[in-house]
A protein has these predicted regions:
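Membrane-interfacial segments
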Residues: 60, 64, 68, 108, ...
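Hydrophobic transmembrane alpha-helices
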Residues: 24-93
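Internal alpha-helical transmembrane segments of multi-pass membrane proteins
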Residues: 147-170
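Conserved small/polar residues in nucleotide/adenosyl-binding loops
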Residues: 234-241
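Juxtamembrane non-transmembrane "cap" segments at the membrane-aqueous interface
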Residues: 169-192
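Interfacial aromatic-anchored transmembrane helix boundaries in multi-pass membrane proteins
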Residues: 57-69, 95-137, 141-142
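Individual transmembrane alpha-helices with interfacial aromatic-anchor signatures
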Residues: 123, 127, 195-216
Length: 241
């Protein structure tokens, strides 16, 4: 071994630099592997939530039809998705909900939105998709904001789970009034309820249905989301952030 080589292997500064380079390379590789793992995991979880929404939408689990009213529980998987997958995941889950709602409108699965689709297809597409997409996105943002505040972290699951069905009702009805209130079809409901303004129409139209949806989603989604969030250990950077 030459003196130069011997000096290289015995020089503390050189050895320290080499050690730092090796550790840096290892850390970089580990970080890349973790990000890839969590990205894959995230996509699998998102796909599972989308599948649940689609299954519920085309079975009695998603829509319970009673005389004179239809109750939807699709806000439950949207709320859970928004909480455990973040705002982007919530947006995609909400969009999926909206697309299933549009399918119901086009095929006649929902008598009400089917009638609206025949009146104005473009407005109906907006009505069925935009409010549901915003619902998921906003629920995710609300949960993220509250969960980052330590003093209210524990209740963030419950607040987000309640906000989801409330946002669904508020956004859907606001869009309905903005786009269809002056149509003869909606005016028949206005006359039927005996109301004289859009606000009274919304209250009368939502009624018991909105209350049931809010309560059920609040209870079920908050329990499921908190349990899943804890079990899946969401503590590292991923698309949900």
């Amino acid at each position: 071994m030459s003196e130069r080589q011997a000096g290289y292997y015995t020089n503390p500064t050189i050895l320290s630099d080499e050690k730092e380079n090796i550790m840096s390379n290892i850390e970089t590789k580990n970080t890349a592997m973790v990000k890839k793992t969590f990205t894959t995991k995230y996509m699998v979880e998102l796909a599972a939530m989308i599948a649940i929404i689609i299954i519920m939408a085309f079975t009695p689990l998603g829509y319970i039809k009673l005389p004179g009213l239809t109750i939807t529980f699709l806000t439950i998987p949207v709320a859970v998705g928004a909480i455990i997958l973040g705002p982007v995941g919530g947006l995609i889950c909400g969009l999926t909900f909206g697309l299933t709602s549009l399918y119901q409108a086009v095929t006649g699965g929902s008598v009400f939105t089917f009638a609206l689709f025949n009146l104005n297809p473009v407005f109906t597409i907006i009505l069925t998709i935009v409010p549901r997409t915003l619902e998921g996105l906003l629920t995710g943002l609300i949960f993220k904001a509250l969960h980052n505040i330590k003093s209210v972290q524990k209740i963030s699951y419950y607040v987000a789970s309640l906000c989801c069905p409330l946002l669904n009702t508020l956004l859907f009805m606001s869009t309905l009034v903005a786009l269809f209130y002056r149509t003869d079809f909606i005016q028949t409901y206005v006359a039927k309820f005996g109301v004289g303004n859009p606000f009274s129409f919304v209250v009368a139209f939502v009624g018991t249905q909105g209350a049931i949806e809010a309560v059920v989603c609040f209870v079920v989604a908050s329990i499921l989301a908190r349990t899943l969030y804890a079990c899946l250990l969401y503590t590292s950077p991923s698309p949900r952030d």
